[in-house]
Amino acid sequence: MNLNATLIAQLVVFFILAWFTMKFVWPPIVKALDERAKKIADGLAAADKAKADLALAEKKVVEELRKARESAGDVRASAEKQASQLVDEARAEASRIIAQAREAAEAEAGAAAQRAKEALRDQVAHLAVAGAEKILRREINAQVHAELLANLKQELQ
């Protein structure tokens, strides 16, 4: 065999093998590599998206915590205000009740004083009548009575 014929035959076989490899072997390998690269890129994109979602979720958590703290502060302030208002209302009610009790006691004391005065007047009147009766029984003197009446008349004028 001739060296040139062998070389040409090897070249033909090489080109057929290269063509066969390029036509049937290389495309599935390239396709598999492209799919693998795409999966890796998708995985990296998903990881980036997950990072972004995690950062967004963390921001939302921080915001919700801030809102919850603010809301708790508002609730606490409202409760303190309501408690203060209830205390003020209770004090006002107690003051009103005390004032009513004081007024009732003063009215009762005034009524008792009035009753005592009337009872005292009645007693003084009874004593005066009794004293006058005793005086009149004891001494009936027309001249003394006339003098008394004259003195009374002068005092009244």
From Swiss-Prot:
Bilayer-spanning residue ranges: 7-27
Main localisation: membrane
Subcellular location field: Cell inner membrane
UniProt cross-references to Pfam families, sorted A to Z: ATP-synt_B (PF00430)
Membrane topology: Single-pass membrane protein
Keyword Membrane: yes
Gene Ontology molecular function terms on file: proton-transporting ATP synthase activity, rotational mechanism; proton-transporting ATPase activity, rotational mechanism
UniProt keyword annotations, A-Z: ATP synthesis, Cell inner membrane, Cell membrane, CF(0), Hydrogen ion transport, Ion transport, Membrane, Transmembrane, Transmembrane helix, Transport
GO CC aspect terms: plasma membrane; proton-transporting ATP synthase complex
InterPro entries to which the protein is assigned, alphabetical: ATP_synth_B-like_membr_sf, ATP_synth_b/b'su_bac/chlpt, ATP_synth_F0_bsu_bac, ATP_synthase_B_chain
Function, as annotated: F(1)F(0) ATP synthase produces ATP from ADP in the presence of a proton or sodium gradient. F-type ATPases consist of two structural domains, F(1) containing the extramembraneous catalytic core and F(0) containing the membrane proton channel, linked together by a central stalk and a peripheral stalk. During catalysis, ATP synthesis in the catalytic domain of F(1) is coupled via a rotary mechanism of the central stalk subunits to proton translocation. Component of the F(0) channel, it forms part of the peripheral stalk, linking F(1) to F(0).
Family to which this protein belongs: Belongs to the ATPase B chain family.
Subunit structure, as described in the record: F-type ATPases have 2 components, F(1) - the catalytic core - and F(0) - the membrane proton channel. F(1) has five subunits: alpha(3), beta(3), gamma(1), delta(1), epsilon(1). F(0) has three main subunits: a(1), b(2) and c(10-14). The alpha and beta chains form an alternating ring which encloses part of the gamma chain. F(1) is attached to F(0) by a central stalk formed by the gamma and epsilon chains, while a peripheral stalk is formed by the delta and b chains.
Protein name: ATP synthase subunit b
